């Protein structure tokens, strides 16, 4: 890394394990400066509950970034709306969570930060606060005015991107259009090259229907939509294999010769990845004008403040963001 970079972290739901994990991240040295967008008292109180040392130093955007020393975090303050009890949701803090996401996103857009790493949010309490919220991916897409973003989850061994994200099953077939697939595959291919340093990405593409449609006998989306798009993109030089049946794609004879899998919908691709590497996975938003990674788990309210939360996914998300920063320099 040519110079020290700043990355911004949002801990997520304040009553969940996000603050715990951020405090745990602070217990080691990092080659980047960790700027945490959060309430100061929330972090110091949670550190005290965990019995871990934590010193907060003020964010100074006009000073050169410094590698993070163990036991410290750089604080970009956002005030809670209500006091926090670990494990107990407070509706008004839904506004606080969205404020942290907005500030962190804006900081990436204006060049303050080289990457954004997000902790788990509670979508229900944000919506209960009167804020329509589908997820991080959609929030950052809208706020950054990105033309299109793609959700991808990754472990050390497997990357799975999604053609559609948080849609009811009944709506998925209609959503799989030639225009959508062109956009999604183009973004996936581009970001694998630019952010992951893969010169010629090899992508496996799932079919939509059982047995990838069985030649049109179990649905025609493969024949009508997926195959024509793949043929067009292959003619442009992309290395695409598919459409393949999702129930047989996830095995070494295919995965050993691929850099990523494109699944047609959320529950087609992610159960395999999460079974294979739950707690070690990272959620990545492709297509944004900045690097964004996230943990692959939820808020785990029942573990907040108990010292039992596993920081593994957060460490992996941060390490991957650092690698992506290096690849884009």
From Swiss-Prot:
Cross-referenced Gene3D superfamilies: Isopropylmalate Dehydrogenase (3.40.718.10)
Keywords per UniProt: Cobalt, Cytoplasm, Magnesium, Metal-binding, NAD, NADP, Oxidoreductase, Pyridoxine biosynthesis, Zinc
User: Where, subcellularly, is it found?
Assistant: Cytoplasm
Q: Which Enzyme Commission number(s) are on file for it?
A: 1.1.1.262
Q: Catalyses which reaction?
A: 4-(phosphooxy)-L-threonine + NAD(+) = 3-amino-2-oxopropyl phosphate + CO2 + NADH
Q: Which InterPro entries match?
A: PdxA, PdxA_fam
User: What are its GO cellular component terms?
Assistant: cytoplasm
Give, as in the UniProt entry, the pathway in which the protein acts: Cofactor biosynthesis; pyridoxine 5'-phosphate biosynthesis; pyridoxine 5'-phosphate from D-erythrose 4-phosphate: step 4/5
Residues bound to substrate: 136-137, 274, 283, 292
Q: Which residues form a coiled coil?
A: none
> What cofactor does this chain's UniProt record say it requires?
Zn(2+); Mg(2+); Co(2+)
Biological process terms from the Gene Ontology for this record are:
pyridoxal phosphate biosynthetic process; pyridoxine biosynthetic process
Q: Its Gene Ontology molecular function terms?
A: 4-hydroxythreonine-4-phosphate dehydrogenase activity; cobalt ion binding; magnesium ion binding; NAD binding; zinc ion binding
Source domain of life is Bacteria
Cofactor-binding details, from the entry: Binds 1 divalent metal cation per subunit. Can use ions such as Zn(2+), Mg(2+) or Co(2+).
* Protein's job: Catalyzes the NAD(P)-dependent oxidation of 4-(phosphooxy)-L-threonine (HTP) into 2-amino-3-oxo-4-(phosphooxy)butyric acid which spontaneously decarboxylates to form 3-amino-2-oxopropyl phosphate (AHAP).
Record's HAMAP family?
PdxA
- By its UniProt entry, which NCBIfam families does this protein fall under? pdxA
Fill in the misc note. The active site is located at the dimer interface.
Report quaternary structure and partners.
Homodimer.
Q: What is this protein called?
A: 4-hydroxythreonine-4-phosphate dehydrogenase
The opening ranks of the lineage are: Bacteria, Pseudomonadati, Pseudomonadota, Gammaproteobacteria, Enterobacterales
The protein's gene is named pdxA
